[in-house]
Amino acid sequence: MQGFFVTGTDTDVGKTVVSAWLLSHLDACYWKPVQAGTEPETDSITVRRLAEVAEDRILPEAYILPDPLSPHEAAKRAGIAIDMNRLKAPACDRPLIVEGAGGLMVPLNDNAFVIDLAA
């Protein structure tokens, strides 16, 4: 499967906007494996709105965590642990745009980082 992993060094640096642009210009699918923070809307909703694509091009998140924090901290506050086995790329018959959460070295749990999703 061909794809792109979109990352950035912080929140609000443009990962979601870049993901939406790639999605629309590459006729791709989009996946945000871990969504931390849901206000005012999730990144998946924003990407779909910006890219103006059908809902089936937006693949469901493995985790949606309410607090806008690093994934490992948001998961702790939600009382769960992020299981890397749930973070396998879903099937898609198009290129896949995967949007990370923060930079590559942001922890997902006690043993894994965002870079592990990109590998």
Predicted regions located by residue number:
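Conserved catalytic-core segment of NTP-binding enzymes
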Residues: 3, 21, 103-119
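Residues at the beta-strand->loop junction immediately N-terminal to the Walker
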Residues: 7-8
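N-terminal phosphate/diphosphate-binding loop that engages ATP/GTP or pyrophosphate donors
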Residues: 3, 12, 17-81, 86-90
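Switch II (G3) loop of P-loop NTPases
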Residues: 86-109
